[in-house]
Swiss-Prot record:
Subcellular location: Cytoplasm
Enzyme active site: C86 (nucleophile), H195, E197
Official protein name in the record: Phosphoribosylformylglycinamidine synthase subunit PurQ
PANTHER family: PHOSPHORIBOSYLFORMYLGLYCINAMIDINE SYNTHASE SUBUNIT PURQ
Pfam family, one: GATase_5
GO biological process: 'de novo' IMP biosynthetic process
Catalysis performed (reactions): N(2)-formyl-N(1)-(5-phospho-beta-D-ribosyl)glycinamide + L-glutamine + ATP + H2O = 2-formamido-N(1)-(5-O-phospho-beta-D-ribosyl)acetamidine + L-glutamate + ADP + phosphate + H(+); L-glutamine + H2O = L-glutamate + NH4(+)
Classification of source organism: Bacteria, Bacillati, Bacillota, Bacilli, Bacillales
Record EC number: 6.3.5.3, 3.5.1.2
Chief localisation class: cytoplasm
Keywords, alphabetical: ATP-binding, Cytoplasm, Glutamine amidotransferase, Hydrolase, Ligase, Nucleotide-binding, Purine biosynthesis
Subunit details: Part of the FGAM synthase complex composed of 1 PurL, 1 PurQ and 2 PurS subunits.
GO function term, MF aspect, one: ATP binding
Length: 230
């Protein structure tokens, strides 16, 4: 397995994401610049948090036109695993791989804290190592994480079990129905505002994010009939 971490001008969580893949998954991982146009050798593509292009216009609005995004869409259509975290989630909605939009936090303030999430769907490539209904702790760091969609889209998300994570307890940004992360209908594209890559070691206060990366690896191994030996 080989993983790509896309780097846009203004990305700032790319190193954290790269290190999480190396530390937890133990597979080859590369930084891929936003102007690159070939992702064919990668099995999973990760879009990190940050402030791509300074968040001008709105979060992700400029990054969605980066040359690499055409290849990200192609990879998603091919069934490869795509995960967007924070700004990466915003970019995935802007490019149309995920429905809805991320608005300014209801408080109009940047929120940076450890948040509790409830796992709504553990039957995905990204959450299979969690239990359904489990409450986990993952940090957030965003000013525009207020998820919104229209009623028809929300009904589809619920019917198709595309709501993967909800905030548990405090809703830090006013997100519709406490939504913290969603996937596409096919289940190979996930977007979430919290940062699992910042919760992969016990010294990080929480290591609950670790299981997202083990889930991705386990999914790829099963899809490619790869066996491991103790």
């Amino acid at each position: 397995m080989r993983v790509a971490v896309i780097v846009f001008p203004g990305s700032n969580a790319d190193v954290d994401l790269f290190n999480a893949v190396e530390d937890v998954m133990g597979v080859p991982v590369d930084y891929v610049w936003h102007s690159d146009t070939d992702l064919s050798k990668y099995d999973a593509i990760l879009l990190p948090g940050g402030f791509s292009y300074g968040d001008y216009l709105r979060c992700g609005a400029v990054a969605r036109f980066s040359p690499v995004m055409e290849q990200v869409v192609k990879a998603a259509d091919e069934g490869k695993l795509i995960m967007g975290i924070c700004n990466g989630f915003q970019i995935l909605t802007e490019v149309g791989l995920l429905p809805g939009a991320l608005l300014r936090n209801r408080s109009l303030k940047f929120r940076c804290k450890l948040s509790e999430l409830r796992v709504e769907n553990n039957d995905t490539s990204f959450t299979r190592d969690f239990a359904a209904g489990e409450v986990i702790q993952i940090p957030i760091a965003h000013g525009e994480g207020n998820y919104y969609c229209d009623e028809e889209t929300l009904a589809k998300l619920k019917a198709n079990k595309q709501i993967v994570f909800r905030y548990h307890g405090e809703n830090p940004n006013g997100s519709l129905e406490d939504i913290a992360g969603i996937c596409n209908e096919r289940g190979n594209v996930l977007g979430m505002m919290p940062h699992p890559e910042r919760a992969v070691h016990s010294w990080m206060t929480s290591d609950d994010g670790r299981r997202m990366f083990t889930s991705i690896l386990k999914t790829w191994r099963e899809q490619n009939s790869v066996t491991t030996h103790a």
